[in-house]
């Protein structure tokens, strides 16, 4: 079987040396992979329990249209999300188009003119800069008289508690905590660290809303931020919780008032959650959530595999190969434009869709420099499917994530290494 497998990898373009190096790394990671599988099993049981508690039935998959009144599948799914993630209520809709939309919705519905938004973990995603008004944009929070302040993490990645205390004012209404690193190389926040930060903030101002941007973090650990005091948790269905099956959508889970505010902003005052047809995608939302713990486990294995390989080749990787994992993203700093692009070409070449396409840097909306993206995905923009991207500027860091199966993630990493090896950008001869 091993010989047959190696021949199949060779057929896909993986050389004998690259394959041997990958097999060596995989053997070293067996114990860590077993721990990931154990966490996935726990989270799988959690999802099943939530579905059974809420009596999910075949009728939940019926298609609704028009206003979407009395959409049983939609309403049941939102109760499943609330129970699964530990919230009082949930908003899970195909009308929420992406993660940025979900975050903007949560912010704009729970802030009012004169309020202040605080980020105690530094700069948010580039795409949120225009939502907040850091970069001027139509309809931003700043246009509505909502101010913003941020406190950067310390150089070692720890919280600047003194700075945070001084940044909390009488009009600080909402604190946004970005769990994942985004296009940065700071540490991703564990649920435990998020809990300690929320406790600190609530001790200073108990009525402040603590919102966690949970993108890329769902099912990575055995609990979610709502379990440690968050009031609201936000994410995208074309990331972890959609399990690779949801074709669109986002969610907001948390305190009932926060979720209701978001629902009235998404639709209209007086309508809220009562309208919004599921339009035939609801079954994929259920099935994707059901598969999500297993899919996330494969993505985690791929991230650790990538970290171990590229760390051994001398590159800086964040997290490193031994650190605990709190999201599915793996950053690799290449310090070289050609190496970064070659990596992305390898990820694209391993895709089941558009494998023949060569990714090129381009001026992506929402970013201040060219971005390169590799994503031969079934769902456009899906970050739980095998993908890699990054801003093409120093330190030329590429952000790798996803893989609907561990085996596909493995192929992607080996293909990325193959591209670098063919161009003499790495030397693996002594490591095989």
Model-derived features: positions:
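Conserved PLP-enzyme active-site core in the AAT-like
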Residues: 2-26, 30, 37, 47-53, ...
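Flexible linker/loop signature enriched in Pro/Ser/Thr and Pro/Gly
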Residues: 84-87
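Conserved C-terminal alpha-helix-loop-beta "cap" of PLP-dependent enzymes
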Residues: 311-431
């Amino acid at each position: 079987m091993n010989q047959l497998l190696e021949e199949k990898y060779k057929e896909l373009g993986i050389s004998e040396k690259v394959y041997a190096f990958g097999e060596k790394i995989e053997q070293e990671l067996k114990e860590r992979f077993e721990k990931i599988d154990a966490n996935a099993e726990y989270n799988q049981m959690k999802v099943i329990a939530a579905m059974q508690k809420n009596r999910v039935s075949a009728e939940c998959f019926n298609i609704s249209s028009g206003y979407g009144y009395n959409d049983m599948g939609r309403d049941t799914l939102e109760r499943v999300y609330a129970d699964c993630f530990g919230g009082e209520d949930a908003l899970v809709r195909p009308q929420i188009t992406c993660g940025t939309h979900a975050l903007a919705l949560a912010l704009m519905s729970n802030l009012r003119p004169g309020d202040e938004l605080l980020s105690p973990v530094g700069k948010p995603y580039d795409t949120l800069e225009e939502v907040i008004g850091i970069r001027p944009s139509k309809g931003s929070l700043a246009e509505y008289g909502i101010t913003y302040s941020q406190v950067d993490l310390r150089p070692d990645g720890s919280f600047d508690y003194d700075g945070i205390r001084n940044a909390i004012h009488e009009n600080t209404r909402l604190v946004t905590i970005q769990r994942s690193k985004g296009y940065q190389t700071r540490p991703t926040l564990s649920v435990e660290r998020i809990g300690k930060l929320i406790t600190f903030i609530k001790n200073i101002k108990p009525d402040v809303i603590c919102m966690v941007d949970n993108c890329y973090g769902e099912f990575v650990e055995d609990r979610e931020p709502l379990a440690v005091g968050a009031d609201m948790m936000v994410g995208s269905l074309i990331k972890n919780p959609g399990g690779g099956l949801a074709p669109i959508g986002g969610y907001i889970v948390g305190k009932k008032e926060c979720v209701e505010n978001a629902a009235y902003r998404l639709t209209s005052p007086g309508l809220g959650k009562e309208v919004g047809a599921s339009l035939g995608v609801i079954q994929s939302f259920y099935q994707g959530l059901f598969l999500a713990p297993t899919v996330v486990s494969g993505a985690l294995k791929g991230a650790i595999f990538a970290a171990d390989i590229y760390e051994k080749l001398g590159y800086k990787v964040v997290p490193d190969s031994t650190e605990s994992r709190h999201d599915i993203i793996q950053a690799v700093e290449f310090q070289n434009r050609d190496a970064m692009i070659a990596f992305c070409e390898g990820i694209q070449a391993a895709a089941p869709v558009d494998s023949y396409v060569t990714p090129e840097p381009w001026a992506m909306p929402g970013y201040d420099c060219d971005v390169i993206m590799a994503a031969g995905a079934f769902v456009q923009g899906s970050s739980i499917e095998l993908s890699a991207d990054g801003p093409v500027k120093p330190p030329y860091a590429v952000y790798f994530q996803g893989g609907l199966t561990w085996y596909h993630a493995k192929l992607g990493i080996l293909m990325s290494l193959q591209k670098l090896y063919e161009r003499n950008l790495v030397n693996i001869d002594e490591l095989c």
